[in-house]
A protein has these predicted regions:
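Sec-dependent N-terminal signal peptides
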Residues: 4-15
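Short, low-complexity N-terminal intrinsically disordered segments enriched in polar/charged residues
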Residues: 17-43
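Short solvent-exposed beta->alpha transition segments
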Residues: 31-32, 47-100
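Exposed beta-sheet edge and beta->alpha loop/turn motif
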Residues: 88-156
Length: 156
């Protein structure tokens, strides 16, 4: 009787372990793609970065507009200093996108002109099993309102 109870438990354990191994591999592979993509942006290779977007994104966007927007953003951010992953997550379904393999990555980044920048990347695996960028977003704190930053003399 004990063997009959242990067998399903063993099956569930092996199945969950297998699933976790694949999730970890998907996250690792997607992270490599995202890191290369971010490096392309930080090195002003915007056209190469744009080509890493999924076909659906490229069909629904204007590459000229995106290239100008990302260039302006990087000028505003200033020179890239450092970046580390703060969270990563695998999902097999996303509302509005359907079933598939998706990885969310969140980075804590530092650029010359901003205190801290959180960068968010969503990647999806296409039908050729290649990871592609689906979305890039960010939030940041500007140095402009830094109380520690000296204000210009206002003639006091």
């Amino acid at each position: 009787m004990k063997k009959l109870v242990l067998l399903p438990l063993l099956f569930l354990f092996v199945h969950n372990l297998n699933g976790q191994i694949f999730k970890d591999k998907y996250i690792k592979d997607a992270t490599k793609v995202a890191n290369i993509w971010l490096e392309q942006i930080n090195n002003n290779n915007y056209s190469e970065a744009y080509n890493q977007y999924s076909e659906k994104v490229k069909e629904n966007s204007d590459s000229t507009y995106w290239l100008k927007a990302i260039d302006q953003l990087m000028v505003e951010f200033g020179i890239f200093k450092s970046r580390k992953i703060s969270s990563s997550k695998f999902e097999n379904t996303i509302e509005g996108l359907g079933d598939g393999f998706y990885v969310f990555l969140e980075y804590e980044s530092i650029y010359k002109n901003i205190k801290r920048c959180d960068e968010y990347i969503l990647l999806g695996q296409n039908d050729k099993f290649k990871w592609k960028i689906l979305r890039y977003d960010f939030s940041y704190e500007s140095n402009e309102l830094d109380p520690e930053k000296e204000l210009p003399n206002q003639g006091n």
